[in-house]
C-alpha cells in the first residue's frame, strides 16, 4: 500500500487510483466544443432554428465550452437523451427524436475520424511514476468503454493502466455502483481507492461509494466544478507518492 500526498492532505494505505478521462487526463475541451458545434449544425440542418438553443444546452456559449456542462461531463446516452428532448419540443415523435440525436452525434464524431485530444501536461509522467509503485491504476469515464480503450491505445498507456472503463449501459455518474464495479474489476476495496476527477459527479460518485478520498482537479481554478472534493489541485504534478 502507498501513501499519496496532494497539497496539505495525505491519503494513507492506498492500493488503487481511478482517474476520470475528459478534463482530467485528457485535454478535451477543444475537441468536445467542436463535437457540440458540429452536432448542433447537423441537427439544425434538419430542424431549422434548433441549433443555437441546442448548442447552449450542450454547454457551449459564445464559442466557449462550460467544463461543467452537458457534453463535458455527461455520458453519451445522457447527451443523446438531452438533445432528443430539444428535438421533441419541435413536434417530432420521441423515437424519431432519439434517432436524429443519435445519428447526428455519430456523424459529428465520425467527421473527426480517429482524432484524439492530447494528454494534459504532466499526465504521462504521473502515470509512469505511479505505475512503478504497487498501485493499481485505472480510468473510469463517462465516455464509452470503446472510447476509453481507444484513448489508452492511442496514447500508449497500456503499460500503466490495469483498467479502462466507461459508461455503456443505464448506469452513469454519479451512481456509486460504477465506482464499486471499477474497484471490483481491479480487485481492490473502495476504502483503499482514490478518485481523481474534474466534476461534481466524480466527487459524488466516489464519496457515495465510500472511497478513501476524492481529488478534484480544475485546470482553470473553478473549485465549484469539483465541489465535494477532499482536496483540489490545479495540475497533476500535485499528486505525489509519499516516501
Predicted feature locations:
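Hydrophobic alpha-helical core bundles mediating ligand binding, dimerization, or RNAP-core interactions
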Residues: 32-43, 79-80, 101-109, 147-152
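Conserved G/P- and acidic residue-centered "switch" motifs that form tight phosphate/ATP-binding loops
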Residues: 24, 141, 198
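A metal-dependent, Asp-based hydrolase signature
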Residues: 52-108, 124, 128-129
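Asp-based, Mg2+/Mn2+-dependent phosphohydrolase catalytic module
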Residues: 1-17, 30, 45, 124-131, ...
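Short, contiguous strand/loop micro-motifs
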Residues: 70, 112-114, 166, 189-190
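Short, acidic loop-to-helix structural element flanking the phosphoryl-transfer center
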Residues: 12-14, 18, 72-77, 81, ...
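Active-site neighborhood of HAD-like aspartate-dependent phosphohydrolases
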Residues: 2-61
Amino acid at each position: 500500500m502507498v501513501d499519496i500526498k496532494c497539497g496539505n492532505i495525505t491519503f494513507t494505505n492506498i492500493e488503487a487510483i481511478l482517474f476520470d478521462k475528459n478534463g482530467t487526463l485528457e485535454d478535451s475541451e477543444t475537441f468536445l466544443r467542436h463535437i457540440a458545434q458540429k452536432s448542433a449544425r447537423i441537427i439544425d440542418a434538419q430542424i431549422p432554428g434548433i441549433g443555437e438553443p441546442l448548442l447552449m444546452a450542450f454547454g457551449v456559449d459564445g464559442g466557449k465550452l462550460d467544463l461543467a456542462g452537458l457534453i463535458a461531463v455527461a455520458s453519451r446516452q445522457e447527451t443523446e437523451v438531452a438533445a432528443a428532448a430539444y428535438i421533441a419540443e419541435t413536434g417530432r415523435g420521441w423515437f424519431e427524436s432519439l434517432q436524429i440525436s443519435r445519428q447526428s452525434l455519430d456523424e459529428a464524431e465520425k467527421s473527426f475520424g480517429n482524432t484524439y485530444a492530447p494528454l494534459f501536461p504532466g499526465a504521462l509522467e504521473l502515470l509512469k511514476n505511479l505505475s512503478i509503485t504497487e498501485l493499481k491504476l485505472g480510468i473510469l469515464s463517462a465516455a464509452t468503454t470503446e472510447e476509453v480503450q481507444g484513448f489508452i491505445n492511442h496514447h500508449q498507456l497500456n503499460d500503466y493502466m490495469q483498467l479502462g472503463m466507461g459508461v455503456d449501459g443505464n448506469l452513469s455518474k454519479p451512481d456509486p455502483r460504477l465506482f464499486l464495479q471499477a474497484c471490483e474489476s481491479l480487485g481492490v476495496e473502495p476504502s483503499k481507492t482514490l478518485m481523481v476527477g474534474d466534476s461534481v459527479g466524480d466527487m459524488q460518485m466516489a464519496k457515495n461509494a465510500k472511497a478513501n478520498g476524492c481529488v478534484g482537479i480544475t485546470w482553470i481554478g473553478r473549485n465549484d466544478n469539483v465541489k465535494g472534493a477532499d482536496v483540489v489541485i490545479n495540475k497533476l504534478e500535485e499528486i505525489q507518492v509519499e516516501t
